[in-house]
Swiss-Prot record:
This is Ribonuclease H. It comes from Thermus thermophilus (strain ATCC BAA-163 / DSM 7039 / HB27). Residues 5-147 form the RNase H type-1 domain. Endonuclease that specifically degrades the RNA of RNA-DNA hybrids. GO terms for cellular component: cytoplasm. Monomer. GO terms for biological process: DNA replication, removal of RNA primer. PROSITE patterns: RNASE_H_1. It is found in: Cytoplasm. One of its GO terms (molecular function) is RNA-DNA hybrid ribonuclease activity. The keyword Magnesium applies. Its EC number is 3.1.26.4. InterPro entries: RNase_H, RNaseH-like_sf, RNaseH_domain, RNaseH_sf, RNaseHI.
Amino acid sequence: MNPSPRKRVALFTDGACLGNPGPGGWAALLRFNAHEKLLSGGEACTTNNRMELKAAIEGLKALKEPCEVDLYTDSHYLKKAFTEGWLEGWRKRGWRTAEGKPVKNRDLWEALLLAMAPHRVRFHFVKGHTGHPENERVDREARRQAQSQAKTPCPPQAPTLFHEEA
């Protein structure tokens, strides 16, 4: 007996940050046929890349069953990690970059891999701020979330004399 085919879902994601680091927000819009669900959140002190990853993670985690997911993002960082082999290379090198430095946002990359595991995900790049309706919608929501976090400024970064540990 053949298993039933997976449902095909569109996931539109965006992250925003007021300063980098600074207050940030993320948004994810899920669409299945005529049904939509908008998810969003924010953090007081984060980066734009962390918010891009968080949007994808939370969108995928909201799915109740394994799906075929078309993930639309305006983040080269997110898309190229999968489509250009960055993530595969980082993992082979023990979460190190080609230069031997620890991969930034490893915690979120690992969370994203877990969130993706039950699904078949295809990444699509959408150029930001070009009038793409869903991208504009998640961009507005991510910025709204970032602004709602702006009450708490990031603590100043203290200079350090030591190398980062893995």
